[in-house]
UniProtKB/Swiss-Prot annotation:
UniProt protein name: Imidazole glycerol phosphate synthase subunit HisH
An example Gene Ontology molecular-function term: imidazoleglycerol-phosphate synthase activity
Organismal lineage: Bacteria, Pseudomonadati, Thermodesulfobacteriota, Desulfuromonadia, Geobacterales
One matching Pfam family: GATase
Catalytic activity, EC: 4.3.2.10, 3.5.1.2
Length: 209
């Protein structure tokens, strides 16, 4: 049985996520086969690009039902960047598009004209920023409040239930930077690009039962 399956649906630099797991001692398999996902102990859904394209590719690749099934069965599941956004109900990126609706909520665009310290904030939000820890999932055991992590995104999550928010970040607005619900942990930031902090998340996820 594959221990960690990284879903390859044509969206994102999956090799960097795979290398992140390798650095902390875990073998992760990049797969475009839904059957491998169904057989895996832990599942990772990365994602870079437009929400609608990511969702379409998941559907065309036959991944939607396997993802919903492994989540229902309680297997550890990690969503990264757009992979986190896809877990919500819908996104307003390029229209209104339905997501997996595992976490009720919406994906919104950063408002225009945001300012901080007298300077206009550019969209996308790109670079290092601080986390404010609200709840600490097992994968965040070594993530300190105020830890710096790496973001690249123009849209952010707004879960209906604030109790699922594990961490927030502020960029013009305070937004949800990480989600934790049961067996699901998801990050808007890229743990594979977040140096020691991010690698600790991958390591602790790999150790989840």
């Amino acid at each position: 049985m594959t221990k960690i399956a990284i879903i390859d649906y044509g969206m994102g630099n999956l090799r960097s996520v795979q290398k992140g797991f390798e650095k902390v001692g875990f073998e992760a398999v990049v797969t475009a086969d839904p059957k491998v996902v169904l057989e895996a102990e832990k599942i990772v859904l990365p994602g870079v690009g437009a929400f609608r394209d990511c969702m379409r590719n998941l559907e065309q690749g036959g991944f939607v039902e396997p993802i919903l099934r492994v989540i229902r069965e309680g297997r550890p599941f990690l969503g990264i960047c757009v992979g986190m956004q896809l877990l919500l109900t819908d996104s307003v990126e390029f229209g209104l598009y339905q997501g997996l609706n595992v976490i009720p909520g919406h994906v919104l665009r950063f408002p225009e004209g945001m300012r901080e310290g007298g300077e206009e904030l550019k969209v996308p939000h790109m670079g290092w920023n601080q986390l404010s820890i609200k709840r600490r999932p097992p994968a965040f055991a070594e993530v300190e409040d105020g830890a710096n992590v790496y973001f690249v995104h123009s849209y952010y999550e707004m879960p209906d239930d604030e109790s699922v928010i594990a961490a927030t970040c502020t960029y013009g607005v305070e937004f949800c930077a990480a989600i934790w619900k049961d067996n699901i942990v998801a990050t808007q930031f890229h743990p594979e690009k977040s140096q020691a902090v991010g690698l600790s998340i991958l390591k602790n996820f790999g150790e989840m039962k």
